[in-house]
Amino acid sequence: MKGLVIKNTGSWYQVKTDNGQLVECKIKGNFRLKGIRSTNPVAVGDRVQIILNQEGTAFISEIEDRKNYIIRRSSNLSKQSHILAANLDQCMLVVTVNYPETSTTFIDRFLASAEAYRVPVKILFNKVDAYDEDELHYLDSLITLYTQIGYPCFKISALTGEGVDTIREELKGRVTLFSGHSGVGKSTLINALVPGLEVKTAEISAYHNKGMHTTTFSEMFPVPGDGYIIDTPGIKGFGTFDMEEEEIGHYFPEIFKTSANCKYGNCTHRQEPGCAVRKAVEEHYISESRYTSYLSMLEDKEEGKYRAAY
């Protein structure tokens, strides 16, 4: 029997079979995927084969080939990854310039990870109703930056409804992963997009000005127009999983394009003579914040660490 994994609760997986039945499944035996070192071999969005036993228990016996997936640092094993979701049509990264602030380093690491696994990303700048003039000016500068690179950007307010109808249209016929720091209003936005869903939300910690986690495990919800939303736990950071040092620049589109003009084919864009990327940064053709994010990922790779980006 075939089905779609719609929820992961750690040891159990909820599968929606092709005939619409919801089945609670476990993994059969020491199930592992070849070539993927992760804490969860099965992810929300996976198409799977399940076996129903006479006792009423069910097991996932096989996973169909994935078209893509996206991973983050495992929360408890720093050198292992955790697959957030599989078979995605797009990611929507929810960010805020304050309450709490999403750093450009975090944004860039997420984008690089999505580029590595061939998942298109749209950036949703939430809480636009809450910003002062300086914050709105900064927000506009970020939108200009990321739009020029090629990432669609949207101004929204989950609280007032600004931009929500536009995002709802973007969900039709697509499997969409929603991600972002805790506290950026991701769950509030999902509730606004799909009235009646009632995804749990939380307050911002007044002491740290950071969000408190409300989503514990990834879960998939149907949305009008034959689409699906995948809600994920709030994420603290992304590491350089499965990336070789020389590949990291490939996942920054503007750096990759400019690197064709570097003097050396293996240029890492740090100290090498004739580096077209460093020249482009100096001449403001490439954003200094993006270049700094790139260097931080190189540093992680050199030190063998998987550092959270705040």
Swiss-Prot record:
Residues that hold Zn(2+) according to the record: C262, C267, H269, C275
Cofactor(s) listed in the protein's UniProt record: Zn(2+)
Subcellular location: Cytoplasm
GO biological-process terms attached to the record: ribosomal small subunit biogenesis
UniProt keywords, alphabetically: Cytoplasm, GTP-binding, Hydrolase, Metal-binding, Nucleotide-binding, Ribosome biogenesis, RNA-binding, rRNA-binding, Zinc
Keyword Transmembrane helix: no
Manner of cofactor binding, per the entry note: Binds 1 zinc ion per subunit.
RNA-binding in keyword set: yes
CP-type G domain sequence ranges: 77-238
GO molecular function term, any single one: GTPase activity
Enzyme class, UniProt record, top EC level: hydrolase
A GO term from the CC aspect: cytoplasm
Protein purpose: One of several proteins that assist in the late maturation steps of the functional core of the 30S ribosomal subunit. Helps release RbfA from mature subunits. May play a role in the assembly of ribosomal proteins into the subunit. Circularly permuted GTPase that catalyzes slow GTP hydrolysis, GTPase activity is stimulated by the 30S ribosomal subunit.
Family: Belongs to the TRAFAC class YlqF/YawG GTPase family. RsgA subfamily.
Subunit structure comment from the entry: Monomer. Associates with 30S ribosomal subunit, binds 16S rRNA.
Protein's recorded name: Small ribosomal subunit biogenesis GTPase RsgA
Organism (species): Bacteroides fragilis (strain YCH46)
Lineage of origin: Bacteria, Pseudomonadati, Bacteroidota, Bacteroidia, Bacteroidales
Name of the gene this protein is made from: rsgA
